[in-house]
Amino acid sequence: MKVMTTIQALTAEIQAAKQAHKTIGLVPTMGYLHEGHLTLAQTARAENDLVVMSIFVNPTQFGPNEDFESYPRDLPRDIALAESVGVDLVFAPSVEEMYPQDGGIRIHAGEQATILCGASRPGHFDGVLQVVAKLFHLTLPTRAYFGQKDAQQVAIITTMVRDFNFPLDMRVVPIVREEDGLAKSSRNIYLSESEREEAPAIHEALQLARDSFLATGDVREALAKAKAHIQIQTHGRIDYIELLAYPDLTPVTETTQQVLLAAAVYIGKTRLIDNSIFTVKEGL
C-alpha cells in the first residue's frame, strides 16, 4: 500500500491508473477509522481495481466552536487499518496542501443544507462539498463510497454530482452499529461510561418512530414518541428529530415513497447523529 501526502504524487498515481484503464474507488474519510469506514473500503475493494482512501480532517466543515482541534487523529493506526482491508493508496494531505490560499472559489450547498444538521451547523455542508469536489477532481473515481449514517451529506453530495456532472457512481453503504445499536462513529470515543450506556437510546427512539409512522402515517405522533424516549432514557439534549422525504429532504406528502427519519442528540458534550431510511410501499 502506498501513502501519499502531496497532490503531485497523488495525481501521478491516478493518471497511471487511468492510462491502464483501471477502475478507481474513492473512500473519503476524516480518519480515526472504525468498522464503518472499513466496511466502505471493503465494499470498494470488491468493486474496483484501485482503492483510494483519503484521510483528511477538513477544517472548512467545522464551525468556530466545534471540535476541529480536538477531533481524534491517529494516522499510523489508520494506515495499518486501511492496509488490512486492502486499500491500495492512502492520501493524507496537510491542510496547507489542500488549501494553500485563503479565500478563492467556494461551493454553496443550497437549500438542502439549511435543515437538519445544517440548521445548527451553518456552512458545514459548504465545507463538505468543497473538500469532496476537490477529492473527486484529484482522484477521478469510478465510484465513491459514503456511509448512510451521514444521510443528509449523501443527499447533498449526490445533488452536487448530478448538477456538476461528475462522471462517477455514488455508492451508499448501510450504517454499521455496535451490538447495542449505537451507530459507529469516531466521536463515540468522547463518551463517558455513563453516556455510552445512554447513547443507544437514539437508535431505539428512531425504531419506535419508524414503527409508529408505518402504522399510522402520522408524522407528529412518530416524532413525539422518539423525543419522549430520548428524554426518558437519557440526560441528552435533542438538536433535532425529523422525518422527511428522501433524498429530496422535503416535507412528507401523500405521494412520498422513501422516508428519512433522522436525529441529532447531544449526549453530554458529544453530538451524535443517526437515521433510518425506509420505504412507504403505497405512499401515505
Curated annotation (Swiss-Prot):
GO BP term (any one): pantothenate biosynthetic process
Keywords: ATP-binding, Cytoplasm, Ligase, Nucleotide-binding, Pantothenate biosynthesis
Pfam families: Pantoate_ligase
Active site as annotated: 37
Residues the entry annotates as binding beta-alanine: 61
Residues that, per the record, bind ATP: 30-37, 147-150, 176, 184-187
Keyword ATP-binding (UniProt): yes
Catalysed reactions, semicolon-separated: (R)-pantoate + beta-alanine + ATP = (R)-pantothenate + AMP + diphosphate + H(+)
InterPro entries noted in UniProt: Cyt_trans-like, Pantoate_ligase, Pantoate_ligase_C, Rossmann-like_a/b/a_fold
Pathways per UniProt: Cofactor biosynthesis; (R)-pantothenate biosynthesis; (R)-pantothenate from (R)-pantoate and beta-alanine: step 1/1
One Gene Ontology MF term: pantoate-beta-alanine ligase activity
GO cellular component: cytosol
UniProt binding sites for (R)-pantoate: 61, 153
EC number in record: 6.3.2.1
Location of the protein in the cell: Cytoplasm
Subunit structure: Homodimer.
Note from the entry: The reaction proceeds by a bi uni uni bi ping pong mechanism.
HAMAP family recorded: PanC
Family stated for the protein in its record: Belongs to the pantothenate synthetase family.
Protein's name in the database: Pantothenate synthetase
Species of origin: Lysinibacillus sphaericus (strain C3-41)
Gene name linked to the record: panC
